[in-house]
A protein has these predicted regions:
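Activation on terminal intrinsically disordered regulatory regions flanking enzyme cores
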Residues: 1-3, 8-11, 15-18, 22, ...
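… and, occasionally, acidic/histidine-rich disordered N-termini of signaling adaptors
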Residues: 46, 52-237, 289-303
Length: 303
């Protein structure tokens, strides 16, 4: 009996030890499972964050791509590759952006007016980027839509001003514009400005002066416009431009009207295409290829 009791006691101790060991194994397994669950939860959280970040990046990339498409479409609309053929006039134009692939508010227009007249406009919206480009596109469309109904530059500028204010209200995002019209049967040039640099005679760089410079479009109903006109001789030429031309910066000064006159003065009776080409080259050299503002040129010469 004593031996059986000892054996039973020993087996009981061994069984207890085995149970304790199993309990420890179970406890360690539970700890491992808890750690594994914690790790899985953390990894899932991190994956969710990464997925959110990746989705946000994809959305930003898609938005940037859509904006680039819009910018290019608007740029092509503001600066079409070809100008229309107009009675009695040769035309040429150019647009030089300050930053590659960026569209500013500069635009030009050569359009048909009444009685075979031609309407020429160069405009500049304050600012850069998509908002300025859209405002410029709207302004250009307003001029293009009204050009067939008048060869009066003051009236055309006023109509564009009304359209801008009706669309967006009075705003600080103003538009400057110069408008020149040409009636070939009378060889009559008419011009007016809404806060825009004066046009220049193509052969000597002198300004086409108006009694007043007018107020920029979009900032109020009263532009204070006045028109000037002149009967031109055959071959007379004019240049409209945005202020990116004269305000281009060199090493220690701006290109200025003096730079424009010097460039044109080196040519003898230049065609519009020649005048635009020499001005593009000269101002790019002057600014070392780094324009600080976009630049728009529109030249015309009567036949």
């Amino acid at each position: 009996m004593g031996d059986d009791a000892e054996r039973n006691e020993r087996e009981l101790r061994e069984l207890r030890l085995e149970v304790d060991e199993q309990r420890r194994d179970i406890s360690e397994s539970d700890d491992r499972e808890r750690r594994q669950d914690t790790l899985i939860t953390r990894l899932r959280d991190e994956a969710a964050v990464h997925d959110h970040d990746a989705a946000a990046l994809r959305n930003r990339l898609e938005a940037a791509e859509h904006e680039l498409v819009d910018l290019r479409a608007i740029r092509d609309a503001l600066t079409p590759p070809e100008l229309p053929q107009r009675p009695g006039l040769d035309l040429a134009a150019a647009f030089l952006p300050a930053v590659a692939e960026q569209v500013s508010g500069d635009f030009y227009l050569g359009a048909e007016g009444p009685q075979d007249s031609t309407v020429l406009v160069v405009g500049d919206v304050v600012g850069h980027g998509l908002n300025a480009a859209r405002r410029a596109a709207f302004a250009r469309t307003a001029f293009a839509a009204t050009a067939p109904f008048s060869d009066d530059p003051c009236r055309l500028l006023s109509w564009a001003n009304t359209a801008l204010i009706e669309r967006a209200g009075i705003t600080s995002e103003f538009v400057t514009a110069g408008c020149v019209t040409y009636l070939p049967d009378e060889r009559l040039l008419r011009w007016a400005y809404a806060g825009h640099p004066r046009a220049l005679w193509l052969d000597n760089g002198q300004e086409l002066v108006a009694p007043t410079q007018g107020t920029a479009l979009g900032i109020g109903p009263d532009l204070g416009l006045t028109e000037s006109s002149q009967r031109s001789v055959a071959g007379a030429g004019v240049l409209l431009y945005s202020d990116g031309l004269t305000e281009a910066r060199g090493a220690d000064r701006r290109f200025g009207i003096g730079g424009v006159r010097a460039a044109l003065g080196g040519l003898s009776w230049p065609s519009p295409a020649e005048a635009v080409a020499i001005l593009r080259a000269r101002v790019a050299d002057f600014a070392y290829g780094a324009l600080t503002d976009d630049l728009c040129l529109l030249a015309a010469r009567s036949r």
